[in-house]
Amino acid sequence: MISDFEIDLLQRYFSVPSQLLFYCPFLSQQKVDVASLPDFSARQHFIAIGNFRHEPNWDSVLWLKHQLWPMIRAQLSVVGMPQAELHIYGAYPPPKATQLHNAKEGFHVNGWATDAQAVMQSARVCLAPLRFGAGIKGKLMDAMRCGTPSITTSIGVESMSGGLPWGGAVADDAEAFVTAAVAHYQVETLWQQEQEQGFAILRDYFYRRDHSLALQTRLTELLHNLQRERGDNFIGQMLRHHSHKSTQYMGQWIEAKNK
């Protein structure tokens, strides 16, 4: 499974034996080539990205449009940065999404990004106000890989950092979210600190070699002890038995029907 939160949920609330579960998240290289990434001054604007058919993404777009972005834009105008824009990317934008586009408000619904990494690297801050959802969030992985600090929620960081400091900020209410977004857009030293924390998460929590070796070790153990593992899995045996029984009775029904 790619999410340690879901593993804990299955064990704690559904009593799934730990030996039936294995944690292997998205994998990342150990080191990001920071020198190849645009620095703070070379970046501009905010970015939000995600498939419009995914309900948590659509909900976050609506929250940005109707509450968060107007507040962010107003605060940036006060500090002399009224030119900041929010660019929203995602596949399958329906008419109700494209109708939200308003260049005068700095709210740009751009639809599909031909190069998601390029647009993420060009942005200064990633906004991901997810109010529900689960699993690893690809947009936040991409943001860390591109050196773009992200402002998200407790749902957003779920299964994303292993307790390490987040590479950006975590806020569940509108005012705290807006304050964090403005601060990260405005203060270069804060931005650099959070960028490095994102790199640390990739290095220490999603490192490819560590998880790959663990997966290889587990598969080898299963291969060498397959009968024992299957014998210890009572529920699995029961489900397998009844699955075979269903095909048995289906076969008998077909035979009777064809007589």
Model-assigned labels for residue ranges:
Residues 118-135, 148:
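Acidic donor-binding loop of glycosyltransferase active sites
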Residues 154-170:
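Short acidic/histidine- and often glycine-rich active-site loop of Leloir-type glycosyltransferases
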Residues 12-16, 21-117, 121-122:
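Conserved catalytic-core segment of nucleotide-activated headgroup transferases in glycan assembly
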